[in-house]
């Protein structure tokens, strides 16, 4: 079985979502996990979640005699990448940065846009952003996207007790 399929099967089987998987130089394998959309109310991935997945993957990769040197498992972070259509559904209403493969002629030949993700309609994705002449809406498909990720929302104000 291919390494990516093996990792995805294991992570999904444990009740998590595989956000991303990377094979880096010198045998480093990076795995990014998150809760499934159904379990999103559980909050953020913890160190304990990463530890649990790491232990399971180490056993599976050893049994399958996978070729790797090191394994890193972590959360996708505040700037979570958006890779699948389900990511755009899940994070509709959130602020995101979207970089397209080609410039959009109807948007001043820009490739990068930052704005609020809209609920996808079929295969069509949308982003509301602030254009040169006020609010604008960009429609695109997943195939048009080079990279996309959430814009981190950090609140440094202290909580009142």
UniProtKB/Swiss-Prot annotation:
The keyword Cytoplasm applies. It comes from the Bacteria. GO terms for cellular component: cytosol. Keywords: Cytoplasm, Ribosome biogenesis. InterPro entries: Ribosome_maturation_RimP, RimP_C, RimP_C_sf, RimP_N, RimP_N_sf. Gene3D superfamilies: RimP-like superfamily, N-terminal. One of its GO terms (biological process) is translation. It is found in: Cytoplasm. SUPFAM superfamilies: YhbC-like, C-terminal domain (SSF74942), YhbC-like, N-terminal domain (SSF75420). Its main location: cytoplasm. It holds the Pfam family RimP_N. The keyword rRNA processing does not apply. HAMAP family: RimP (MF_01077). Belongs to the RimP family. Required for maturation of 30S ribosomal subunits. This is Ribosome maturation factor RimP. It comes from Herminiimonas arsenicoxydans. The lineage of its organism: Bacteria, Pseudomonadati, Pseudomonadota, Betaproteobacteria, Burkholderiales. The gene is rimP.
């Amino acid at each position: 079985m291919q390494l990516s399929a093996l990792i995805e099967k294991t992570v999904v089987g444990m009740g998590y979502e595989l956000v991303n998987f990377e094979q880096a130089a010198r045998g480093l394998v990076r795995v990014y996990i998150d809760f499934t959309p159904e379990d999103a109310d559980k909050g953020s991935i913890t160190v304990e979640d990463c530890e649990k997945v790491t232990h399971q993957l180490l056993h599976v990769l050893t049994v399958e005699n996978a070729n790797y040197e090191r394994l890193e498992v972590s959360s996708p972070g505040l700037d979570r990448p958006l890779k699948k259509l389900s990511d755009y559904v899940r994070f509709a209403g959130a602020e995101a940065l979207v970089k397209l493969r080609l410039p959009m002629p109807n948007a001043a030949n820009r490739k990068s846009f930052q704005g609020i993700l809209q609920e996808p309609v079929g295969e069509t994705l949308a982003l509301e952003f602030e254009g040169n002449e006020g609010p604008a809406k960009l429609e695109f498909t997943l195939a048009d996207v080079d990279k996309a990720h959430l814009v981190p929302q950090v609140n440094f104000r202290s909580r009142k007790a």
